[in-house]
């Protein structure tokens, strides 16, 4: 199948949205599916997102997206994000009367409210409007589906996440004092958080905990420098990638996930796959993954997360690994494929034949008018 992906989130951004789509695309490309990925780095005029300059917003994108659409002739269009590119892709599909699917990867209203004086109800009105005409809205967890249904969203389907169990593996654990120990010189146990260092991630709830050993944060983001100054006893290691990141996960004793705004939290599975138990609040994502797993603890929001974190020290690391092995990227990719909204074959054939005829007419007219001008 030929699939057009429209996304405001792509490299060099490092987040769960980008990692999810990269892995799904890689799995499906290996099976022969073709992709055209439309993202801000593809020659669009961009402007930095206020308060978060690392994120670029593509401007005046509709014409260029339509040109890509006509050149690629996709069988399905999937819109990943609700940003400026996502808006342009949605508008194009509606104008062209072409079906499309969307995804609800992030709590957009909460993210916006954390940065600007915009109430969450206004954000949900926008997001509900954005997804209204999507043939299928892919949502990370069943609890997120229930929450959005209660807000009158339609066409929702649960679409879980996977984890690379080869990249994230207990064998990469380095014990205290070993050569290459990423936490060299730090008192044990190691309580770790990995992710974007931003206000919406609720990282302060983690670094303020009274925990034994060492509190470590791996990641970069707009809140990093401020947190470094405010919490000098916390160890901020910056962004890590590849084997360096995998070694951090596996060498930690407990992974602490304080976020209340994630819709899933890929890092939770990455930690478990590395053999590291997870302590989290009872928020969307963790409450769908952790209960019954024996691979972590769930704390009611506002409860004692420090106790949940220290309780994780008694959990069996092998059990964490076994549980994470049940999340396959191949299954996630196939579910994505099944949720796309392609036109039926006869209708698709007529759609593109009609569009080609119109395009040829426009070209012929342009050539004719240019001759009249000379």
Question: Where are the regions a protein language model picked out?
Answer:
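Aromatic "clamp/platform" in nucleotide-sugar-dependent glycosyltransferases that forms part
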Residues: 260
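Short hydrophobic beta-strand element within catalytic cores of glycosyltransferases
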Residues: 277-280
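Donor nucleotide-sugar binding/catalytic pocket of nucleotide-sugar-dependent glycosyltransferases
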Residues: 125-180
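Conserved donor-binding/catalytic core segment of Leloir-type glycosyltransferases
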Residues: 180-216
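Nucleotide-activated donor-binding/catalytic signature segment of Leloir-type glycosyltransferases, i.e.
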Residues: 224-243
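A charged, aromatic-enriched C-terminal amphipathic alpha-helix characteristic of glycosyltransferases
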Residues: 314-364
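Short alpha-helical donor nucleotide-sugar binding micro-motif in glycosyltransferases
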Residues: 69, 240, 247-252, 336
């Amino acid at each position: 199948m030929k699939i057009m992906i429209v996304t405001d989130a792509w490299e060099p951004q490092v987040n769960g949205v980008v990692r999810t789509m990269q892995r799904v695309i890689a799995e499906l490309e290996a099976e022969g599916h073709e992709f055209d990925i439309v993202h801000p780095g593809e020659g669009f005029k961009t402007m930095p997102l206020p308060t978060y300059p690392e994120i670029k917003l593509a401007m005046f994108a509709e014409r260029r997206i339509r040109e890509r659409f006509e050149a690629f002739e996709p069988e399905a269009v999937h819109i990943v994000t609700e940003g400026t590119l996502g808006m342009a892709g949605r508008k194009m599909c509606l104008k062209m009367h072409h079906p499309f699917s969307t995804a609800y990867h992030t709590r957009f209203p909460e993210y916006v409210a954390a940065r600007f004086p915009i109430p969450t109800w206004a954000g949900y009105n926008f997001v509900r409007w954005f997804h209204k005409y999507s043939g299928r809205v892919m949502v990370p967890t069943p609890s997120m589906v229930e929450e959005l249904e209660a807000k009158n969203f339609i066409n929702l389907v649960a679409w879980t996440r996977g984890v690379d169990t080869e990249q994230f593996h207990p064998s990469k654990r380095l014990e205290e004092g070993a050569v290459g120990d990423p936490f060299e010189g730090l008192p044990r146990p190691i309580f770790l958080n990995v992710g974007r260092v931003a206000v919406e991630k609720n990282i302060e709830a983690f670094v303020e905990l009274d925990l034994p050993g060492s509190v470590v944060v791996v990641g970069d983001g707009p809140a990093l420098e401020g947190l470094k100054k405010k919490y000098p006893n916390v160890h901020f290691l910056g962004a890590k990638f590849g084997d360096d990141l995998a070694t951090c996960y596996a060498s930690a004793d407990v992974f602490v996930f304080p976020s209340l705004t994630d819709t899933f939290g890929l890092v939770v599975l990455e930690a478990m796959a590395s053999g590291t138990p997870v302590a989290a609040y009872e928020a969307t994502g963790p409450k769908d993954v952790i209960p019954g797993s024996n691979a972590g603890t769930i704390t009611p929001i506002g409860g004692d997360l420090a106790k949940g974190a220290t309780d994780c020290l008694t959990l069996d690391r092998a059990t964490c690994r076994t549980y994470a092995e049940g999340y396959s990227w191949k299954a996630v990719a196939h579910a994505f494929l099944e949720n796309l909204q392609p036109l039926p074959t006869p209708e698709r054939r007529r759609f593109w034949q009609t569009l080609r005829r119109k395009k040829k007419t426009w070209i012929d007219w342009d050539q004719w008018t240019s001759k009249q001008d000379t």
